[in-house]
């Protein structure tokens, strides 16, 4: 019987996940299909019950359901539990629903694919304190990045993650701007304002260190205002596309046991999104 998978969210129209997973199914001769499902917050419980009843083998979860879905699941893996957020659900052969979060590990794989894995002792500045920030901070810590600093408009939110995870320290945006030259890797983890065109830089990059690596988790647009400003300062930039592809590939592996070809997918999506 043909397996089927989905992505649930609100909005969902612009998701690249269906095209990505269906291309992988075809490439790997997997009898499966992947569909986008628009699910509002009010419909979430009914949607999970429906997915289960209709025999979905698994699904991805996007905004705004990553935390709200947790009560409907039977188990969480350690990373999802630590983050309090789920982006991948696996339905076991016994019908159990297990929640995973592949965002943080997907980011680390993307970063190391772009710049190598020899930067683990370098000072890292993480900008933002939302769900994505929590996952990336935890995954970087797990993967051996030992010098992490978080900054956020509301410092208390960054401090809460630092305290909970026992990582580094939290500083204000003002201090981040003043001490920017100290950091070798800067990761921009907020998407506020991008969709509406009201994005404002969290701080000036005038003090950016020569040879710094600057990453953004947003993949559409590929060149965010933050990355544009960093590139003008001579930084090595890492777009959010690699993270998107790798988090999807890790989900694919949870569902089917094989890791798909991420390189060709990054090239393909890069062309679609107008990259070089």
UniProtKB/Swiss-Prot annotation:
Under the heading Gene3D superfamilies, the entry gives: Leucine Dehydrogenase, chain A, domain 1, NAD(P)-binding Rossmann-like Domain
Q: Which pathway, metabolic or otherwise, does it act in?
A: Metabolic intermediate biosynthesis; chorismate biosynthesis; chorismate from D-erythrose 4-phosphate and phosphoenolpyruvate: step 4/7
Which positions are annotated as binding NADP(+)? 78, 128-132, 217, 240
Top-level taxon: Bacteria
Which residues of the sequence carry a binding annotation for shikimate?
Answer: 15-17, 62, 87, 103, 219
Q: Which GO terms describe its molecular function?
A: NADP binding; shikimate 3-dehydrogenase (NADP+) activity
Return the EC number: 1.1.1.25
Catalytic reactions of this protein: shikimate + NADP(+) = 3-dehydroshikimate + NADPH + H(+)
InterPro entries listed in its UniProt record:
Aminoacid_DH-like_N_sf, NAD(P)-bd_dom_sf, SDH_C, Shikimate_DH, Shikimate_DH-bd_N, Shikimate_DH_fam, Shikm_DH/Glu-tRNA_Rdtase
- Among the Pfam families in the record, one is Shikimate_DH
* UniProt enzyme class: oxidoreductase
Keywords, alphabetical: Amino-acid biosynthesis, Aromatic amino acid biosynthesis, NADP, Oxidoreductase
Sorted alphabetically, the Gene Ontology cellular component annotations on this record are: cytosol
How this chain assembles, per its entry, is: Homodimer.
**Chain's role:** Involved in the biosynthesis of the chorismate, which leads to the biosynthesis of aromatic amino acids. Catalyzes the reversible NADPH linked reduction of 3-dehydroshikimate (DHSA) to yield shikimate (SA).
> What's this protein's family per the entry?
Belongs to the shikimate dehydrogenase family.
- Know the name of this protein? Shikimate dehydrogenase (NADP(+))
Tell me what organism the protein belongs to: Lysinibacillus sphaericus (strain C3-41)
